[in-house]
């Protein structure tokens, strides 16, 4: 049976490719496409972003869209996602959350909501990125002495949070494998006379510019050699297809908090 899927942020960069991904996916049906009331796209066919007719017209009424919905896919902003999540909990509608930039309080709210509905919450829905997380765990356990860890990420000029959620997740995976607390060892950017590098540090460097979809590299640097594990995304479709896959996977999950490692069976 097809999953009735609601896309939030229909006119955004991710919303547009999510709509196309749902329209193309077997076992998925575009139930509603939601956008801001002032977006200028309300009332238009959601398929206009991919050059086809979908029969679903963009609306600003999120609550009405939940009637008959199975899953909401939300790649918007933290404050909006949390508001949508409350409505989903009240109506028993599952969620796929790709929004990044949540603070600790926001993440705690998601964990609490997952006690009532099924939620897939991930920093990145790309299959390749999630394989990269697995490789980083393996690498960190082997390169655990004498290797400095640095994470470099690049995104388009419009991205509003830094470092990216994916970069932070890479750091968490590596820190966990090394037995470190990322909150204690993370270094975000360097300037001026910094002194010698702390060998326990995990450094982050951020680049913003142009239309870069998403590049991430974890560098393990020792004296005499370095190992780099990289992922480069060339299309947002890879994230959208992963999110739709997650929505379909949620079909038999009444409640619980999951990520793409669960969806892909990588645990």
Curated annotation (Swiss-Prot):
Pathway annotation from the record: Amino-acid biosynthesis; L-lysine biosynthesis via DAP pathway; (S)-tetrahydrodipicolinate from L-aspartate: step 4/4
Residues at which NADP(+) binds: 36
Residues at which NAD(+) binds: 9-14, 35, 98-100, 122-125
Gene Ontology BP annotations: diaminopimelate biosynthetic process; lysine biosynthetic process via diaminopimelate
Entry EC number(s): 1.17.1.8
Keyword Calcium listed: no
Enzyme class: oxidoreductase
InterPro entries: DapB_C, DapB_N, DapB_N_CS, DHDPR_bac, NAD(P)-bd_dom_sf
Cellular compartment(s): Cytoplasm
List of residues binding (S)-2,3,4,5-tetrahydrodipicolinate: 156, 165-166
Broad class of the protein's primary localization: cytoplasm
Keywords: Amino-acid biosynthesis, Cytoplasm, Diaminopimelate biosynthesis, Lysine biosynthesis, NAD, NADP, Oxidoreductase
CDD domains in UniProt: DHDPR_N (cd02274)
Active site: 155, 159
Catalytic activity: (S)-2,3,4,5-tetrahydrodipicolinate + NAD(+) + H2O = (2S,4S)-4-hydroxy-2,3,4,5-tetrahydrodipicolinate + NADH + H(+); (S)-2,3,4,5-tetrahydrodipicolinate + NADP(+) + H2O = (2S,4S)-4-hydroxy-2,3,4,5-tetrahydrodipicolinate + NADPH + H(+)
Function: Catalyzes the conversion of 4-hydroxy-tetrahydrodipicolinate (HTPA) to tetrahydrodipicolinate.
Family to which this protein belongs: Belongs to the DapB family.
Protein name: 4-hydroxy-tetrahydrodipicolinate reductase
Organism: Chromobacterium violaceum (strain ATCC 12472 / DSM 30191 / JCM 1249 / CCUG 213 / NBRC 12614 / NCIMB 9131 / NCTC 9757 / MK)
Gene name, Swiss-Prot/TrEMBL: dapB
């Amino acid at each position: 049976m097809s999953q009735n899927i609601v896309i939030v942020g229909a006119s955004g960069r991710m919303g547009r490719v999510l709509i196309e991904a749902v329209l193309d996916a077997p076992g998925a049906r575009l139930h509603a496409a939601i956008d801001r009331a002032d977006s200028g796209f309300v009332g238009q066919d959601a398929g206009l972003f991919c050059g086809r007719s979908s029969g679903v017209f963009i609306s600003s009424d999120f609550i009405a869209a939940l009637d008959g919905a199975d899953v909401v896919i939300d790649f918007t902003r933290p404050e909006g996602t949390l508001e949508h999540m409350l409505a989903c909990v009240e109506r028993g509608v599952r969620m796929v959350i790709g929004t990044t930039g949540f603070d600790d309080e926001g993440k705690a709210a998601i964990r609490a909501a997952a006690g009532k509905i099924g939620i897939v919450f991930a920093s990145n829905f790309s299959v390749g990125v999630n394989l990269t997380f697995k490789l980083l765990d393996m690498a960190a356990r082997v390169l655990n002495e004498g290797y400095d860890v640095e994470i470099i990420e690049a995104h388009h000029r419009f991205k509003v949070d830094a470092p990216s959620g994916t970069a932070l997740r890479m750091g968490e995976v590596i820190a966990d494998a090394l037995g470190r607390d990322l909150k204690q060892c993370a270094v975000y950017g360097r300037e001026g006379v910094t002194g010698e590098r702390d060998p326990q540090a995990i450094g982050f460097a951020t680049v913003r510019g142009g239309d870069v979809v998403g590049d991430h590299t974890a560098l393990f640097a020792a004296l005499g050699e370095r190992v780099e594990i990289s992922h480069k995304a060339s299309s947002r479709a890879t994230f959208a297809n992963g999110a739709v896959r997650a929505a379909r996977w949620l079909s038999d999950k009444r409640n619980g908090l999951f990520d793409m490692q669960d969806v892909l069976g990588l645990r």
